[in-house]
Amino acid sequence: WFEEQNLIPGSNIEISATKHPGTMIISAEKKRSNKEWIKTVLVGADGGLVFALLRQPIYAGFNERMAIAIPDQEGLDKIWQDRSGRNIQLKSDVFRMMNELSKLNSQHHVHFVDLYAAINVIRRTPPMELLEALSTNPEIIHVGDHYYHLADQGKE
């Protein structure tokens, strides 16, 4: 359904009740097609992920922090498959994603919601688990207003 509607992660959808119990109506917040600069996850030949700000065709309203374009869904599916049998620590995924996302702005700060959306591209993680991983790690600095910074990036 998401692909048929040309939706990306972070697209706005509306869920409405109906007269029938257990039945809901799901609709996308449609808008005229245009290209927007949004976070895009690219899958490298080595299976690594890279985030970049690229112009992508957008067909629905979206949350700027949550929206992530995924041009190579098959490559991302392969990453999910490869990771499924391994017990990868959330901490290592947080470092990897923070390292990638911090490249997208000059201060190298990463907003919690941006990180939450990026982490959920490669694993399903509830917000509280991610918040705990951020708040208990001395190598991650909270700089205010839900922004975080990797401690070693200040030494560049």
Which stretches of residues belong to each language-model region?
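Acidic, low-complexity intrinsically disordered regions
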Residues: 1-156
